[in-house]
Regions:
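Conserved ATP-binding/catalytic core of the eukaryotic-like protein kinase fold
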Residues: 11, 64-326, 341
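N-terminal alpha-helical segment
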Residues: 2-3, 18-19, 103-106, 345
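Structured, non-catalytic alpha/beta "coupling" segments that mediate domain-domain communication
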Residues: 32-58
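Short, hydrophobic secondary-structure boundary micro-motifs
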Residues: 19-21, 35-36, 49-53, 288-290, ...
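Short hinge/gating elements
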Residues: 326-335
Length: 349
């Protein structure tokens, strides 16, 4: 296998331990090849990758300045402890609130140099989207403010969890248990829709699962590209710019990929939920991620709009030896898993 094909195969294995075992087996004693593949993977992680971040999450040319906050920095009553996330326009920190109560929180702040009118509007829209919702499976907004230099921030509930797909695989959860978690996620998204908010970027890394008294609890996070339907999220109505792709391609609905300027509605989130369910059941997304990674921008759009996804029950037969691992993560074997997925789940996912 070429280094490129090894790299693409490794990207499809989210669990670090399983990815390392795959690389050990495929690279063998070729230490130089392993080092080059590891560097490719590290560069991909550092860049985020088009499939791993929202397509609209780009940095305006010439506006970026280095992040000035470091562990120990005080922003209002919040002491920053460590960076836990970063997007195109914002950075998320784990922080400790010191007054009037002491607790751990997540603090999201606009990057230096990114405080343009459009970015601030998007940032404020995310804060307002979270503020209007009150659901146990959606991260809560606790506070908001601005730094001395005027950069806005908001404070959220700290969700110490892992992406829903990783949680299910690590715990070898059978399909029935995965469906229970998925239904809970659907209830959370339904609540957002009832409040007039479309998420627009539903994917595993935006659905984190944590344990409460030994019970897995999913939390929907990151409404950074959310859109209002029946209420205004900011004082100025936000429109998606014509020709701007909003969402993450592997989970994106055809109407999002179209970029025609036409409004999308709650059905777009429902489509993305279907992709998430497909991945929970089969371990893969409906459109082969390798095809998306090697495709150009126009081809990505065409694949999302036109590609015919195989039914979940037949997808396993195309995965070769990987099907045994995926089925094992679901507490069964490939034949039984295919039988389980045939029927209603084939049509729902």
């Amino acid at each position: 296998m070429t280094e490129r094909s090894i790299f693409l195969e490794a990207l499809d294995i989210p669990d670090p331990a399983r990815r390392a075992r795959y690389l050990d087996a495929i690279c063998g004693d070729d230490a130089a090849q392993r080092e080059r593949v590891d560097k490719l993977l590290a560069a991909h992680e550092a860049a985020g990758g088009i499939l791993d971040r929202p397509a609209a999450d780009e940095v305006p040319t010439g506006m970026y300045r280095p992040i000035t906050e470091t562990p120990g920095t005080l922003i209002g009553p919040y002491k920053l402890l460590q960076q836990i996330g970063e997007g195109g326009f914002g950075v998320v920190y784990m922080a400790e609130q010191q007054a009037p109560v002491r607790r751990m929180v997540a603090l999201k702040i606009i990057k230096p140099g990114m405080d343009t009118r459009q970015v601030i509007a998007r940032f404020e829209a995310e804060r307002q989207a979270l503020a209007v919702m009150d659901h146990p499976n959606i991260a809560k907004v606790l506070d908001a403010g601005a730094t001395e230099s005027g950069r806005p921030y908001f404070v959220m509930e700290l969700v110490k969890g892992v992406p829903i797909t990783e949680f299910c695989d690590q715990n070898h959860m059978p399909a029935a248990e995965r469906l229970k978690l998925f239904v809970t996620v659907c209830h959370a998204i339904q609540h957002a829709h009832q409040k007039g908010v479309i998420h627009r970027d539903i994917k595993p890394t935006n659905v984190l699962v944590t344990l409460h008294d030994g019970v897995p609890v999913p939390k929907v996070i990151d409404f950074g590209v959310a859109k209002a339907t029946v209420l205004r999220l900011t004082e100025k109505t936000l429109f998606t710019a014509y020709g701007q792709m909003v969402g993450t391609p592997a989970y994106m609905s055809p109407e999002q990929a179209e970029m025609s300027g036409l409004d999308i509605d709650t059905r777009s989130d429902i489509y993305s939920l279907g992709v998430l369910l497909y991945e929970l059941l089969t371990g893969t997304t409906p459109i082969d991620s390798k095809r998306l990674r090697t495709a150009g921008y126009a081809e990505i759009q065409r694949l999302i709009r036109e590609a015919e996804a195989p039914r979940p029950s037949t997808r396993l037969s195309s995965l070769g030896g990987e099907a045994t691992v995926l089925a094992g993560n679901r507490g069964t074997d490939p034949r039984r898993l295919a039988q389980l997925l045939a029927g209603d789940l084939d049509w729902i996912a």
